[in-house]
């Protein structure tokens, strides 16, 4: 580089240092993209901009990547280490410099032809200042590039809203070996790079925004809404104009009013807020979503719903991943001042809890959703319908998902892909309110005062987690499961073919399974799981560390799913982090520390335990069986677990099929044997008395679930003809009684939805016949197996209410072996 050019870059870099604060995507490009800084890198930028080049250089130096301003010297030939695909627009249009990218690509390919050991990494990088999509019909399109003067003002105004996006590298060695090294390949490389940057920019900025009134006019002109308006006028005996005004009022209630400036401002506020409230936001598997957006997919984000914070956190994460914040389906309860107008500008559109009896509303909403898909906006909705009060996934509500498929049946949309997302927290600000609601308190209506009270509680929130699950392409799903689905395409009438409901139900279940597959274990949910497993809710520091180590080894050596994330910290680091959250008490004595979960915190901590209960449910069940039997063959263990696995699978959205269960159990048994929690004697699995303490705590994780199943099966066995409604009601009443008598603090223990799912599963699995009567022989077999795993006191409580005298006089199961309770603080 010449001396004058060095001076020029230094002078240009002075204002850029002050004005530009760019974000890098992905956050750690070297590890996430598999870059090798020791090998030569050719940086490829979309168009000639010195501001972009120097912004890239700053990030390269920060990431320990080669300097793009230093040329590469290979075999005595010196070539630039960066290339611009286009020269870009100029202030003076008549000056069009010669394009150098094709020549440079050809030179590099030539070097590979002459040097078989050479392998240069071609690294596409885009630098963006601002991400305004612009308005339809206003000025130049948003994909335009900027000339020097425009770039100056962009840097001045948007320097702190800029990002540097690194893409996956292309091996020039592979290109040379597979496609040759002539100029045709160089031209092709430049053309493919140009398309790559264009798609990437569209994924980051999104399509132009329509004027709200223009959108309403277009919706009003649709055949479906015209018909619904005519039906409204006829059924309510009002004028056509009045019915049309009703439709416009509904559009005003529903539609978002997306504003890029509002997104920019909220990003500043949220960045400041997250940095003070959270110790970190952990994001995993975002690259798969960036790739979907770049490939032109219409993305529908379907996260689990833990907190009102979900709306803001997910939009914030997506924005920082270089993606357009989605249009979000929010409950109408959030449409209060000032939150409603703010959420609208951030992309929220509002949805009522029920559409029943209002055909005009359902038509307007469906057409609005379809229009979002047609225009190419990403959409987000919570398939659970509302926030989980227990920390578990709720049964999915399928209305909006059904409308998504109906939007495909209008024709003309891009390929729609559902992206399940697991959102996890170490502290959920509403968890105290959830506990009150589960105890019968009336849910407060959201308002400004409630919002301010919530903001007051925002402190020391620990870590947040956003894990993107395995995408589910709708077209691929329908082609596989409903090959004739295209026969139902109709651009006017909303279609409800016979296959729609079963397909939607199956899709909803797959989404929930994939959300759970992407679960995040963390310090809070692991410590809560261990302490709640102790009957005294207390463990010595050594016991707790031992139990955390047991959980971590299980999750690492026998992982639940490839998308599940496990902390890379030691048990000591996790415990210290959890103690800093001020949820637990520490009592010190001369022997050591005792970690205590206070009584008032116990119910709240079940929320965090339930976030990951599905990850440990099968190891807990194995531990429980070995604890009771002391000696059991693998075959017998598999038989017993197979009987109740369908109930666990339906309740916790587990992903293992019946065919996968034997192999899964073998893997878990091998890991428990490796940890010496059990002894594998070849023909039998045997209890290891030396490690009974961690085994007992592990077994406790399934205790309450099995008790709940035993309640329903005992009622079915005693009264085979009981109807479904009565069975669910009686089960809940008995569960509440059991929780009072035996100190069970889990709010989901008598949750209505849990018993509803259980009864439905019993019917599907053949325990209840088509006539509605229980098959007593089957229900008794499972009940006897479950009751043997419970303490005599719990069994007696259940049978004293549900089982008639002759049924209770079954041959007694072997006495439950005496096993020492882990030492800890006893209850006062």
UniProtKB/Swiss-Prot annotation:
EC class: transferase
Domain of life from the UniProt record: Bacteria
Any Pfam family the entry gives: Acyltransferase
Keyword Acyltransferase: yes
GO molecular function: glycerol-3-phosphate O-acyltransferase activity
GO CC annotation: plasma membrane
Catalysis performed (reactions): sn-glycerol 3-phosphate + an acyl-CoA = a 1-acyl-sn-glycero-3-phosphate + CoA
E.C. designation(s): 2.3.1.15
Motif, HXXXXD motif: chain positions: 304-309
Signal peptide residue numbers: none
Subcellular location: Cell inner membrane
Biological process, per Gene Ontology: CDP-diacylglycerol biosynthetic process; fatty acid metabolic process
Ranges where the record places region Disordered: 802-828
Annotated CDD domains: LPLAT_DHAPAT-like
Membrane topology: Peripheral membrane protein
Pathway(s) per entry: Phospholipid metabolism; CDP-diacylglycerol biosynthesis; CDP-diacylglycerol from sn-glycerol 3-phosphate: step 1/3
Keywords: Acyltransferase, Cell inner membrane, Cell membrane, Lipid biosynthesis, Lipid metabolism, Membrane, Phospholipid biosynthesis, Phospholipid metabolism, Transferase
Family: Belongs to the GPAT/DAPAT family.
NCBIfam families registered for this protein in UniProt: plsB (TIGR03703), PRK04974.1 (NF003441)
Free-text note regarding domains: The HXXXXD motif is essential for acyltransferase activity and may constitute the binding site for the phosphate moiety of the glycerol-3-phosphate.
Protein name as annotated: Glycerol-3-phosphate acyltransferase
Lineage per the UniProt record: Bacteria, Pseudomonadati, Pseudomonadota, Gammaproteobacteria, Enterobacterales
Gene name linked to the record: plsB
């Amino acid at each position: 580089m010449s001396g004058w050019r060095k001076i020029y870059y230094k002078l240009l870099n002075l204002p850029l240092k002050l004005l530009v604060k760019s974000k890098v995507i992905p956050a750690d490009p070297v590890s996430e993209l598999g870059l090798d800084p020791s090998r030569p890198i050719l940086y490829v930028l979309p168009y000639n901009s010195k501001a972009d080049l120097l912004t890239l250089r700053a990030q390269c130096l920060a990431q320990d990547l080669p300097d793009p301003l230093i040329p590469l010297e290979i075999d005595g030939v010196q070539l630039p280490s960066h290339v611009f695909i286009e020269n870009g627009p100029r202030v003076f249009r008549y000056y069009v410099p010669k394009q150098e990218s094709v020549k440079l690509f050809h030179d590099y390919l030539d070097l590979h032809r002459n040097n078989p050991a050479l392998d240069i990494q071609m690294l596409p990088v885009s630098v963006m200042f601002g991400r305004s999509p612009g308005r339809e019909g206003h000025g130049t399109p948003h994909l335009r590039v900027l000339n020097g003067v425009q770039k100056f003002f962009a840097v001045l105004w948007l320097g702190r809203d800029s990002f540097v996006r690194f893409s996956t590298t292309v091996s020039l060695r592979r290109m040379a070996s597979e496609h040759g090294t002539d100029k045709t390949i160089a031209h092709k490389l430049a053309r493919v790079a140009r398309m790559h940057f264009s798609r990437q920019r569209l994924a980051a900025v999104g399509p132009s925004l329509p004027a709200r009134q223009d959108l309403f006019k277009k919706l009003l002109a649709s055949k479906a809404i015209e018909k619904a308006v005519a039906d409204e006028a006829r059924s309510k005996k009002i004028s056509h104009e009045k019915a049309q005004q009703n439709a416009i009022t509904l559009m005003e209630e529903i539609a978002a009013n997306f504003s890029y400036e509002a997104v920019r401002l909220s990003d500043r506020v949220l960045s400041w807020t997250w940095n003070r409230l959270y110790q970190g936001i952990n994001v995993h598997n975002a690259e798969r979503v960036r790739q979907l957006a770049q490939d032109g997919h219409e993305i529908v984000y379907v996260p689990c719903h833990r907190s009102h914070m979900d709306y803001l956190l997910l939009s914030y994460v997506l924005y920082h991943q270089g993606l357009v914040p989605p249009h979000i389906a929010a409950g109408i309860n959030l449409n209060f001042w000032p939150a409603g107008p703010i959420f609208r500008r951030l992309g929220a559109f509002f949805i009522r809890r029920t559409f029943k009896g209002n055909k005009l509303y359902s038509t307007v909403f469906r057409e609005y959703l379809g229009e979002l898909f047609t225009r190419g906006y990403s959409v987000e909705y919570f398939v659970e319908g509302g926030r989980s009060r227990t920390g578990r996934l709720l049964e999915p509500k399928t209305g909006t998902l059904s409308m998504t498929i109906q939007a495909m049946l209008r024709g003309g949309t891009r390929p729609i892909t559902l992206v399940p997302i697991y959102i996890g927290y170490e502290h959920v600000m509403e968890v105290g309110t959830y506990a009150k609601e589960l105890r019968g308190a009336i849910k407060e209506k959201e308002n400004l005062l409630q919002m301010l009270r919530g903001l007051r509680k925002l402190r020391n929130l620990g870590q947040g987690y956003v894990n993107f699950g395995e995408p589910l392409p709708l077209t691929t799903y329908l082609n596989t499961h409903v090959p004739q689905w295209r026969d139902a395409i109709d651009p006017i009438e909303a279609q409800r073919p016979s296959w729609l409901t079963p397909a939607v139900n199956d899709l909803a279940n797959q989404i929930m399974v994939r959300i759970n597959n992407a679960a995040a274990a963390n310090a809070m949910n692991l410590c809560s799981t261990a302490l709640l497993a102790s009957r005294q809710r207390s463990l010595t520091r050594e016991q707790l560390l031992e139990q955390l180590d047991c959980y971590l080894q299980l999750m690492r050596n026998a992982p639940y799913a490839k998308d599940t994330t496990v902390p890379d910290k030691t048990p000591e680091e996790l415990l210290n982090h959890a103690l800093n959250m001020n949820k637990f008490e520490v009592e010190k004595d001369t022997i050591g520390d005792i970690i205590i979960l206070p009584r008032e915190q116990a119910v709240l901590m079940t929320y965090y335990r339930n976030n990951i209960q599905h990850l440990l449910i099968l190891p807990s069940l194995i531990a429980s069986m070995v604890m009771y039997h002391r000696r059991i063959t693998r075959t017998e263990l598999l038989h017993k677990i197979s009987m109740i696995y369908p109930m666990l699978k339906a309740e916790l959205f587990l992903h293992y099929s019946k065919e996968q269960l034997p192999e899964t159990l073998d893997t878990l048994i091998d890991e428990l044997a490796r940890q010496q929690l059990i002894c594998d004697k070849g023909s039998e699995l045997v209890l290891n008395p030396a490690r009974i303490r961690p085994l007992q705590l592990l077994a406790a994780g399934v205790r309450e679930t099995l008790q709940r199943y035993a309640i329903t099966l005992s009622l079915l066995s005693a009264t085979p003809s009981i109807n479904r409604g009565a069975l669910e009601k009686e089960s809940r009443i008995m569960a509440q009684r059991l929780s009072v008598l035996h100190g069970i603090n889990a709010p989901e223990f008598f949750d209505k939805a849990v018993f509803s799912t259980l009864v439905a599963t019993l019917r599907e699995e053949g325990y209840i016949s088509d006539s509605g009567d229980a098959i007593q022989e089957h229900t008794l077999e499972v009940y006897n197996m479950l009751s043997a795993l419970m303490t005599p006191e719990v069994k007696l409580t259940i049978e004293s209410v549900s089982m008639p005298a002759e049924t209770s006089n079954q041959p007694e199961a072997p006495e439950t072996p005496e096993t020492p309770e882990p030492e800890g603080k006893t209850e006062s």
